[in-house]
């Protein structure tokens, strides 16, 4: 029976793609921190979870942003980075600009969470934060080049987590986990290439082939990174 009403006013966004706009409303709780360059980072969930279950993800998010800023040589583009665990969410996570949404399993970490699940949470957060530059700050003219967004992000999630948690040796997983599926899928007659022409919006959802756009595309990017060397590759990304 609440009768309060109000008008919410938001700051004007930078120029952005409409598919990256999100709103979240609910009875939420959260933890916050600030990066060394002053970006406000927050992780939120419903009150069904202890507040301490958000600490791991907050730490990963802060350090991931700081890593990407150093690696790309480009500051995080907007004032805040909020991460929300949703009780019911069809996607794994979505890189809405400044308001990333997740399934709870990819953001909430409790004392019984396995090491593997913690690694997965870190990779998903790093993936969505990579998109804040690849896909959000720099967006393709059309969906034909979706693979660039997802391939970069899929590779960079491993580069990032390997840098902030070197003892995990996470890049060993990158070099093996997605390769068999990508090779098998790529050998199928009529399989799509990483770059697919899109003539109608109804075709967009067909592009999200995990074995091709994510696994194969990210390995192609890694081949380029190894061929150029990490320093020159990073310089190229800065120009990009």
What are these language model-derived features?
Residues 1-59, 79:
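Non-catalytic architectural context of zinc metalloproteases
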Residues 10, 42-240:
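Hydrophobic alpha-helical and helix-loop surface patches within well-folded domains
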């Amino acid at each position: 029976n609440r009768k309060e009403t109000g008008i919410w006013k938001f700051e004007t966004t930078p120029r952005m793609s409409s598919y990256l706009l999100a709103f979240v409303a609910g009875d939420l709780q959260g933890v916050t921190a600030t990066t060394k360059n002053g970006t406000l980072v927050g992780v939120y969930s419903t009150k069904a979870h202890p507040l301490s279950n958000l600490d791991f993800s907050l730490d990963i998010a802060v350090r991931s942003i700081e890593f990407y800023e150093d690696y790309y040589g480009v500051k995080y583009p907007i004032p805040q980075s909020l991460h929300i665990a949703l009780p019911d969410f069809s996607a794994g996570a979505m890189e809405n600009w400044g308001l990333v949404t997740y399934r709870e399993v990819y953001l909430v970490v409790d004392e019984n969470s396995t090491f593997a699940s913690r690694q997965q949470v870190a990779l998903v957060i790093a993936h969505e934060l990579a998109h804040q530059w690849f896909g959000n700050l720099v967006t393709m003219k059309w969906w034909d080049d979706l693979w660039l967004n997802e391939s970069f992000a899929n590779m960079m999630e491993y580069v990032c987590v390997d840098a902030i948690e070197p003892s995990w040796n996470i890049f060993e997983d990158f070099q093996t986990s997605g390769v068999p599926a990508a090779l098998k899928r790529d050998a199928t007659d009529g399989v799509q290439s990483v770059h697919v022409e899109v003539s109608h919006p109804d075709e967009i959802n067909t592009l999200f082939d995990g074995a091709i756009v994510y696994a194969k595309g990210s390995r192609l990017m890694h081949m380029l990174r190894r061929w150029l060397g990490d320093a020159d590759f990073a310089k190229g990304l800065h120009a990009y």
